[in-house]
Amino acid sequence: VKKLHDSHQDYARWDDAVTGLYNVPDAEFVRSGYTDSTSTGIIFDTAFLIDETGKDLFALRDGATLATSSRAYFGAAFAHILKESDRPAGEYAVASGFFQTPDGIAAAVAGPVVPFSAGFPVPAGQKRMLVIAKHLTEAMVKNLGEEFVIADLKLAAPDFHAEQNVTLADP
């Protein structure tokens, strides 16, 4: 989740992101910065941009547009990370959680799109919240096990009993 937090800051606390995502989001900026990133899935595979009214301005998964809202995709607990990361205009914060999505378990991070440079203007009355997520696929969990030298690390059903385990719960 820490890598996702760090990546969120790279994609959201960025002068170019303010220019490209406020007002009407620039389609080419969205494609090159977010759609393409979800298509590779290296850093994140899902992204949503939400405006100050709670409307999704884009919804992306694996390089394609999602036909569902962020709230429907992540479920009721999603409101918690939006609230936790909500700050006054220009102030950066981030919150995260694990969610059961239609595509499986995902770690998601939410926070406002803000400038990196002091004094860089943010359009008055607007707010953009960027949400990025990475799904815990079997391949991804296997790679984590190899990276951290944890033999046989894998996802298991909730009723699977093992000597060593970590429970991921979506309240």
Where are these regions (language model features)?
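Soluble extramembrane regions of membrane proteins in the secretory/endomembrane system
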Residues: 56-57, 63, 107-109
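Short acidic/glycine-rich beta-turn/loop cap or linker motifs at sensory/regulatory domain boundaries
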Residues: 50-55
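Short, hydrophobic beta-strand elements of compact beta-sandwich sensory domains
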Residues: 107-114, 120-136, 168-171
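Short acidic/polar mixed-charge low-complexity motifs
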Residues: 102-105
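Extracytoplasmic/periplasmic sensor domains and loops in membrane signaling proteins
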Residues: 21-44, 59-100, 133-171
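Juxtamembrane extracytoplasmic/periplasmic/luminal helical "stalk" adjacent to the first N-terminal
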Residues: 1-23
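Short, surface-exposed beta-strand-loop junctions and turns on beta-sheet-rich folds
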Residues: 64-65, 114-116
